[in-house]
Amino acid sequence: MTKVELAKLRTMIPEMRRVRRIHFIGIGGAGMGGIAEVLANEGYQVTGSDLARNAVTERLASLGAHIFVGHSAEHVSEASVVVVSTAIKQDNPELLAARELRIPVVRRAEMLAELMRFRHGIAIAGTHGKTTTTSLVASIYAEADRDPTFVIGGLLNSAGTNARLGSSRYLIAEADESDASFLHLQPMVSIVTNIEADHMETYGGDFSKLKATFIDFLHNLPFYGLAVVCVDDPVIRGMLPEIARPTITYGLSDDADVQVLDFVQTSNRSCFRVRRKDAGELAVTLNLPGIHNALNAAAAIAVATEDGIGDDAIICALAKFEGVGRRFQQYGEFETGRGKAMLVDDYGHHPSEVKVTINAARTGWPDKRLVMVFQPHRYTRTRDLYEDFSDVLSKVDVLVMLEVYAAGEEPIPGADGRALCRSIRSRGSLEPIFAATPDDVPAILADLIGEGDLVLTQGAGNVGALSRRLGEMKLSIDSMKSGA
C-alpha cells in the first residue's frame, strides 16, 4: 500500500491527527495486537508492553512497533493515548503513570470503535464461534475483492496474521462481550452466534443483564443496519421480539431465513446445502469439521449475500478456507513408535465449545480413540460451570486433566483440576489422570497413546504451547519420555 493510500486512510479518523504515539499495555494478546497492527499500518507510532515476547509481538516489531518486555512507568511518558486490555490490573505501573500524567486511557474496544467509526463495520459477537465466524466473513470479502480491514482474535492461517489493513471501507472485527466493552462499537452489521452464561462476573451473576446487554449491542446498529442472529439458540429466539432492527436469522431450524440442510462431514471437510429465503440455494463444501462450523459459515453467507457478494466468491472462499489458529488445528498424524496417532489443538474452554469439538472429532474420525488433554481456564468459570464441565469431559475415552489456568484469578477451593477429576471419576465411566503442570504431560502421554488415537489438547491457556511442543516431538514415545 502506497503512502498516498495510507494518508487517505488516515483521513478516515481526522480528529486522530493529534495522536502521534499509541501505547498498548498487554500488546501480546491477539485482540490487542490486531488493533496495534492496523494502527501501525495506518502510520501511527505504536509502542507496547507485555510480560513476554510472542509471535504477536515479533510481528508487530517487524512492522516498526517498539515492544517492551515487562511493565514500567517510563514506557508511557511519550504516549498520546494508552490502550489497555481487560487483563490489566488497576495497579499496573504503566496504567498508574498514564493517569498521573493525564494521558487518555481507553479500552481495546474503544480504540476498535474509533477504527470502525467511519468505516462499514461488521461486528461478530456471541459466546462461542466469534473468531471462526469473523475469519469466514473476512475470507469471503477478500475472495470477492472487497479488500477488507479485519481484526480477529486468532491467526487467520491464509493471511498469516490476525489483523490486516485493507484499502476499502469494510472493517470486520470480533466484538467482545466479556467486559461489555462491545457496546462502544457502532457497526453497520452485527452477527450474534449464541448467548450462554460466561463472564458472569461482568454482569453481576445476572443472566438477564447479559441478555439485555446483547440487545443493547444490536440496538447500536443504525435503524437501517442489519442484525444476523442464530435462531437455533433458545436465548436468541426468545429475544427476537425485542430486537428493533432489520434482522436475518440463520440456523438448522425450518423457520431460519438462511438454513443449513443435509450436513455431512468426512474427516476435516463438511458438505451441506444452504437455503436462502430471498436468494438461490447453495451447495457448500467447507474446509472445517463440525456442524457448529456450518452454522458459522451460514452467518457469513447471510452477511455476504445481503451485501451483494456473488455466489462464486462465497463458495470458493469456504471451500479453500485454511482455518484459524488453535481452532481444531491439526498438527498431523505421526508414527509414535506404537502406531500412528493424530494431534489436534483447540482453543475451546467453555463446556459447549468442548462438546462441539468432541462431536466434530467423533464425527470425522469415528474409529479413533479420543485422548483429551484439558486445561480449565479461570477458577470462576470452573466454579460456575462445574457440573457442565464434569458431564462433557466424561464423554472422551482418555482424559488428562491439567490444573486451572488462572488468568490472573485467585484459586477457589473446590474449583480446580483435582476437584474436576474427582467429580468425573464419581460418574464411573472414566478414570482421569491429573497432570500438575504441562511439563508432566508428554511422559504421561508416552504411556497412554497407541495406534489410531486422536490426541486433542483443549483450552485457552498455555496448553496451546504444550500442543506445539507435542507437535515438535511428533508424538514420539521416545521423545516424550525423554522430554526432548
Swiss-Prot record:
Keyword Cytoplasm listed: yes
InterPro entries in the cross-refs: Mur-like_cat_sf (IPR036565), Mur_ligase_C (IPR004101), Mur_ligase_C_dom_sf (IPR036615), Mur_ligase_cen (IPR013221), Mur_ligase_N (IPR000713), MurCDEF_pg_biosynth (IPR050061), UDP-N-AcMur_Ala_ligase_MurC (IPR005758)
Main location: cytoplasm
Subcellular compartments: Cytoplasm
Pathway: Cell wall biogenesis; peptidoglycan biosynthesis
Pfam families in the record: Mur_ligase (PF01225), Mur_ligase_C (PF02875), Mur_ligase_M (PF08245)
Binding site for ATP: G126, T127, H128, G129, K130, T131, T132
Reactions catalysed according to its record: UDP-N-acetyl-alpha-D-muramate + L-alanine + ATP = UDP-N-acetyl-alpha-D-muramoyl-L-alanine + ADP + phosphate + H(+)
Keyword Magnesium: no
MF annotations from Gene Ontology: ATP binding; UDP-N-acetylmuramate-L-alanine ligase activity
Entry's Gene Ontology BP terms: cell division; cell wall organization; peptidoglycan biosynthetic process; regulation of cell shape
One of the record's GO cellular component terms: cytoplasm
EC assignment: 6.3.2.8
Coiled-coil features, chain-numbered ranges: none
EC category name: ligase
Keywords: ATP-binding, Cell cycle, Cell division, Cell shape, Cell wall biogenesis/degradation, Cytoplasm, Ligase, Nucleotide-binding, Peptidoglycan synthesis
Function: Cell wall formation.
Similarity remark: Belongs to the MurCDEF family.
Name of the protein in question: UDP-N-acetylmuramate--L-alanine ligase
Origin species: Aeromonas salmonicida (strain A449)
